[in-house]
Design a protein with these regions (language model features):
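Active-site neighborhoods and metal-handling regions in enzymes and metal-associated proteins
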Residues: 1-254
Length: 254
């Protein structure tokens, strides 16, 4: 069953989303050559503590990090370590926090200096696809309308979508119903209703869709070694327009 949030619950989700977005923006500003991914994870821990929130990821199915931090061909679920960020890298960060019992979940991809033109195109187009996907999060539409849009747009631009990991409902739990894949048929899946909150989570590869899991049993990488982009927003479905909850300044799409 897909939870429908009441007004006071939605307000708590707004606060959680704003907090997650603020922490992600702060972490993004710290990305620079020579910084280790472990230092970024530690900074995330400190920022969460200062904000009076806790990580939604730490300990989840025994995940060892406060955030997911992944570089280049690493798609998602990377773990902070002694690895140093280099000029030309693309650093992906996924932040999930619990505030007053409610979760905010958001992700972004940060280019370090100048990246390869095709990689820059991947990042730009993935952000544009996310914007388009969010605009479809309206009552009466179905999850498959979002899924099909993402897949169609990615393929149109010569990219591929990751099939092993998907977007999801979010609220009191990190992963609620419905699943929101980045592939599917238009008109399929659950119908969206006002009061639902979903994480639209794009993972789009420059090359092929095939994924491998590293020896740490967490980090997912592209099998062909080409870069991947990761962007995510928590979105509230309303009777008027989709509301992005994971923005430092609240965004309401027209």
């Amino acid at each position: 069953m897909i939870p429908i949030k009441r007004d006071h619950e939605i307000e708590k989700m707004r606060r959680a989303g704003e907090c997650a977005a603020s922490i992600l923006a702060d972490l993004a500003s710290r990305i620079a050559p020579g910084v280790t991914t472990g230092e970024i994870d530690h900074a995330a821990s400190q920022l969460m503590s200062q904000a009076g929130v806790r990580s939604a990821f730490l300990g989840y199915k025994k995940f060892p990090g406060h955030i997911c931090i992944s570089i280049n061909e690493e798609i998602v679920h990377g773990i902070g370590s002694s690895r140093r960020i280099a000029y030309g890298d693309v650093v992906k960060m996924d932040v999930g926090i619990i505030r007053d019992g409610w979760i905010g979940d958001t992700a972004t991809s940060v280019p370090v200096g100048i990246v390869e033109p095709e990689t820059e195109r991947l990042l730009t187009i993935t952000q544009q696809i996310l914007d388009g996907a969010v605009s479809l999060a309206r009552p009466g539409n179905r999850v498959g309308d979002i899924s099909n849009f993402v897949e169609t747009e990615a393929i149109k631009h010569g990219f591929s979508v990751v099939r092993e990991f998907v977007g999801h409902g979010v609220g009191r739990q990190l992963h609620e119903e419905p699943q929101v894949p980045n592939f599917g048929k238009r008109g399929s899946g659950p119908k969206l209703k006002s009061g639902m909150t979903i994480a639209i989570e794009l993972m789009i590869n420059l090359g092929k869709a095939k994924v491998k899991i590293l020896a740490d049993k967490w980090t997912a990488v592209t099998a062909d070694g080409l870069p991947s982009a990761h962007f995510e927003h928590t979105v509230l479905i309303t009777d008027s327009a989709p509301e992005v909850l994971t923005c430092s300044a609240k965004t309401l799409l027209k």
